Amino acid sequence: MEITNKYILGRLIKKNRGNFKLIKAIQKLIDDIENSNWKTPHDISDNRPDVDSVYGGKFYFFNINVHRTLIMIEFEDNGEATIVWAGSHDDYELTFKNNRNVIKKWLRDNNWIKT
């Protein structure tokens, strides 16, 4: 799978320089995505138990427990994975309030979805 917006993860890595466990976990996520051919949500969760579908089977949060880091990724039918958002758990709570309706509104406000 091809990953777009990888720079978002680059910023997260730069912000957390020295946290080698987190950097290793992010690199493993990148490797897992790039070396996968996931077709269904079940395929994703079989390979990554830290995943949670947050909107319509297209947007997923990966919970990197090493540093309570969350990464939202959109998986498209054409085999492309797009990094949408990444941050600490505190950033997640501040932005999304642990609420799926707030996530949906954020996706809409940032032109990731239309409805």
Where are these regions (language model features)?
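Basic, Lys/Arg-enriched alpha-helical interface segments
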Residues: 1-68, 75-81, 89-115
